A protein has these predicted regions:
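Mid-domain beta-loop-alpha active-site segment that forms a flexible
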Residues: 165-180, 199-207, 251, 255
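Aromatic-enriched alpha-helical interface/lid elements that frame and gate functional surfaces
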Residues: 233-310, 314
């Protein structure tokens, strides 16, 4: 789909490389520029005492890319990036704006070299405002600053960190979408543009329903416990064999009678305390207690059949071990085989990129590269002579 699109990725860690990997899975040619020593995420498992050749965290964001190592602290290294950008379609970076400007790698500088360039800047907080040059990571910019962390705290609880790269990869999707939209425009007009994505803005968008309520009414409801829900049947419950599951109640009175039948409490269908939304809200704790007792009389397998028979919208609360064996994950194409970096033809299971294109090659295009694996190849494609390439390696400008 994106075959023929050239992407220069000047980025480390996860959010921007994740966007680059989505584009690569979709067919773009992605060249990753790494600092001497490589992207720090290459060391993810070594920091916890392992020395794996395959690094599933790094590979997930970098499979199929080319890698060049350039010392961008040197003017000659910065010049090499400018050469690479001249015939690129996309420049993707998560370097802070101030550093890019000092290096002459900001949008205004690069668009003079390539007016059709789609330049995607992925930062913590955006390109304008007092915090534009502040370092950003997902737990700070996406999770904490946005209010998402606060909204997820149960009453009386404390803030807790989100899982690895949750906000990063959400922002990867946003950046990839923005890049694709700008590529369509560039194809129509012949002119590129600046695409601005940030962890902060994406975090605000993900909680946009609550933020919309806050902006409109000046307040928002706090996160309540199971027995305090406004819609108590939209909740989490536990089975006799200690399996948790969620129920999502539809609008109106659609689900109350079916749920009563599931737990064999048909007499409650017409009980005035519970037979309308207002009554259930006023008696939330009692509703939850009744359903807890009813659901707790069944093992998950038996209860699943009863819920399905009544067309209740529900889902199990799965562990990642459960997900890794879930047939629906494979049927949806959400788990794919990634070529091993060992180069022996073996593969291992890894998450797919977020969108499926039936009939298209939308999966991994190869293993993740070793640091600088393609440096000489890329320099040669820029027209550099063999002697020039050797000199660049000898000087430490590239590796």
């Amino acid at each position: 789909m994106l075959e023929g699109i050239k992407v220069v990725e000047y980025a480390t860690y996860m959010a921007a490389p994740g966007a680059g990997c989505i584009l690569r899975d979709w067919g773009a040619d992605v060249t990753k520029i790494e600092p001497p020593g490589g992207d720090p995420i290459r060391l993810f498992f070594r920091t916890i005492g392992t020395d794996l050749q395959d690094n599933p965290v790094f590979d997930f964001d970098n499979r199929g890319k080319k890698s060049v190592v350039i010392d961008t602290s040197k003017p000659e290294g910065q010049g090499l990036i400018r050469e690479m950008v001249k015939d690129a379609d996309v420049f993707l970076t998560n370097v802070r704006p101030g550093g890019l400007t000092r290096s002459g790698l900001d949008y205004e500088s690069l668009k003079t070299l390539n007016p059709k360039l789609v330049y995607c800047s992925l930062t913590g907080y955006g390109l304008e405002g007092p915090d534009a040059d502040r370092p950003g990571f997902d737990i700070a910019s996406f999770w904490s600053r946005t209010g998402v962390a606060n909204l997820t705290i149960p009453k009386g609880g404390e803030p807790f960190p989100l899982r690895t790269a949750f906000g990063d990869h959400t922002t990867s999707i946003a950046a990839a979408a923005g890049i694709c939209a700008a590529l369509v425009e560039a194809g129509r007009t012949g002119k590129g543009r600046l695409v601005e994505a940030s962890l902060f803005r994406t975090g605000l968008y993900t909680m946009g329903s609550d933020l919309a309520i806050q902006l409109f009414f000046g307040r928002v409801a706090s996160t309540k416990g199971r027995g305090e829900q406004n819609v108590p049947i939209s909740n989490f419950f536990q089975t006799r064999d200690d399996k948790w599951f969620c129920i999502v109640a539809r609008q109106g009175e659609t689900d109350w009678a079916p749920l009563c039948r599931v737990v064999s409490r048909e007499e409650l269908i017409t009980d005035p305390r519970f037979n309308n939304a207002k009554g259930r809200r006023a008696n939330s704790a009692e509703v939850v207690a009744i359903l807890d007792a009813g659901f707790g009389a069944y093992d998950m397998a038996d209860l699943a059949a009863r819920l399905d028979a009544e067309s209740i919208a529900w889902a199990p609360v799965q562990t990642l071990a459960d997900v890794s064996k879930d047939p629906q994950a494979f049927a949806a194409g959400a788990i794919v085989q990634t070529p091993s970096a060992k180069g022996d033809g073996t593969t291992y299971a890894s998450p797919a990129s977020p969108v499926r294109f039936p009939g298209a090659d939308d999966g991994p295009k190869g293993p993740s590269p070793t640091p600088g694996q393609h440096t000489a190849e890329v320099l040669a494609s820029l027209g550099r002579s063999e002697a020039d390439i050797k000199a660049l390696f000898a000087s430490g400008i590239v590796a």
